[in-house]
């Protein structure tokens, strides 16, 4: 619209200028023609120009022409086109052509509108996406800072405790982790036990003999005696450990290694199975530096329980054997008495059979009694551990 106004204004100025020039040209022509014309009785003769209409007519004519020029400039229609318009035959547009034209214009407007909206929507989406990414990054950063700050505040106490526990564990690990071989580790453990409580040392007797049964028997020596006797044995053992021989801890570990490689022996341990014993020893070998104290305590309790129960069983065996022997002795005495004499030969034969049976029972009872008594004696023997050897039989 603004471009039309500018073009119209320029055309108006040109039209006004042309109108002024036309009026001036007409005025000059009239003056020129008036010079050659003749007047008679107030009328002009010999002139081809139209009669003079006067200044008022000229002014009206100029205004009319100026108005037409202004109209042409505003509507964008040239004078020539207006003059030729009546000569042009008006073409009648059919309804089908008009509908097709409208459809094409509508489709074009729709495509233009859709394309414009799409472009605007895509750009706006990109802009909002960029804004959202920036806001998300900012929020995420603030959230992480808040979480980090809260975690530090809430977990500071726990972390200090965990750090202290870790430091303690690291120190403990360093104590054992610096051991370069098995001997050095066993020496450290042995020294640690001697410095703490010698009564907690178990399986630390002389294990030079490869007989595992005798080693087990020696490990329980002293339980039947007083604490003073047990302390004396521990003192003697400590003196042996101080000698130039391999440490008792090393001997114990070597012996347990052999047991693990060759299998555990199957001596009677009450209700405890061979598999449980082997698992306990293997557990001690795999984590010796950590479980030595607990393993020693478990073994001590276990062996003490077995000792007490085995001793009770031996006492009962001796008592039962003695009762059986007394009964067999009474039967033998009864069947060998004098009041059997004077009976028939058949009775004599039966009497002899009963006497032989009583003698046989007596001999068996005496044998069982002697075995029970010997085993009980071996149990209390502190010299060679024959009790455990006899248990194998």
UniProtKB/Swiss-Prot annotation:
Residue span of region Disordered: 86-112, 186-251
Localization annotation: Mitochondrion outer membrane
GO cellular component: mitochondrial outer membrane; mitochondrion
Bias (Polar residues) ranges: 194-210
Topological domain ranges for the Cytoplasmic compartment: 23-393
Key words, A-Z: Membrane, Mitochondrion, Mitochondrion outer membrane, Transmembrane, Transmembrane helix
Ranges of Basic and acidic residues composition bias in the record: 230-251
Mitochondrial intermembrane topological domain: 1-4
Bilayer-spanning residue ranges: 5-22
Top-level taxon in the UniProt lineage: Eukaryota
Subunit structure: Interacts with AIM5, FCJ1 and MOS1.
More info: Present with 6490 molecules/cell in log phase SD medium.
Name recorded for this polypeptide: Mitochondrial outer membrane protein OM45
Name of the gene: OM45
